[in-house]
Amino acid sequence: MQSEAGAAGAVHGSLQSGALTTTYTASQGLLLMIPNMYKMAGELLPGVFHVSARALAASSLSIFGDHQDVMATRQTGFALLAESGVQEVMDLSAVAHLSAIKGRVPFINFFDGFRTSHEIQKIELWLMMIWLN
């Protein structure tokens, strides 16, 4: 793919064919995906975008956490789900996927773009198993 715009097009096509599809991106990439996000939400395709939310900058060198990238997608029709820690990211990622499938609504699952995305922490898998049962 040349950019995240192409990746969003690939996700859209994959979802249309019935595959369970997700992608992971950060601030500038998310803004390039917005045109395809309108299509996915309008077609009620159950995709999930995991977003490492960072401040938008002229270059891609910003390490400051900010939600302006995610807030730019509010009007697309995607449901938003926010996490504040590594355990929450693990648990609510599964919730986002299950909710997208059950409700036929695409989700943006977002968290802090520098602290949480680079944090190393032991997680409890049994918490995620509760959601799957």
Label the model's feature ranges:
Residues 70-74, 121-124:
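Metal-ion/cofactor- or nucleotide/acyl-coenzyme-handling active-site neighborhoods
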Residues 107-133:
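Conformationally flexible catalytic loops at phosphate/diphosphate-handling active centers
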Residues 1-72, 78-101:
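Thiamine diphosphate
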